[in-house]
């Protein structure tokens, strides 16, 4: 790696440690020519994941869409931002563990609903109403009845 100060191509690693979240490694390097220090980060290169939408179009996986959708469903409910992030983490972990390069929105929705149901039933029904595209109050009531029957 070239030194950002003098562009020399060789350096030595002075310090190396994992970042707080463990997703990358932070390295302090010292240039062997000018002796100046700089920091680099090493991260695993991931394959981009495509999401297959209901209309069969494809777009790149965007974690922010999951978080934003959950924020709306959990608005004014006792669900923390940390819990929302954990659900998004679970979706990413599931996709990663199955080594998928493409995933449909149904699969993502199922993972979200399974996890959200454990945290807050009202948020679950709110999310389900959008995800499953409830057309009328009867569909809404069926979902609530199913939820109540399982409890």
Curated annotation (Swiss-Prot):
Per the database record, which ranges form the ATP-cone domain?
49-139
Print the keywords alphabetically: ATP-binding, DNA-binding, Metal-binding, Nucleotide-binding, Repressor, Transcription, Transcription regulation, Zinc, Zinc-finger
- What is the documented function of this protein? Negatively regulates transcription of bacterial ribonucleotide reductase nrd genes and operons by binding to NrdR-boxes.
List the protein's name: Transcriptional repressor NrdR
Q: How is the cofactor bound?
A: Binds 1 zinc ion.
Give the family from UniProt: Belongs to the NrdR family.
Q: Enumerate the NCBIfam families for this protein.
A: transcriptional regulator NrdR (TIGR00244)
> What intrachain disulfides are recorded?
none
Report the cofactors. Answer: Zn(2+)
This chain is encoded by the gene named nrdR
InterPro entries linked to this entry: ATP-cone_dom (IPR005144), NrdR-like_N (IPR055173), RNR_NrdR-like (IPR003796)
ZnF region ranges: unnamed: 3-34
A GO molecular-function descriptor:
DNA binding
Record flagged with keyword RNA-binding? no
Q: Which GO terms describe its biological process?
A: negative regulation of DNA-templated transcription
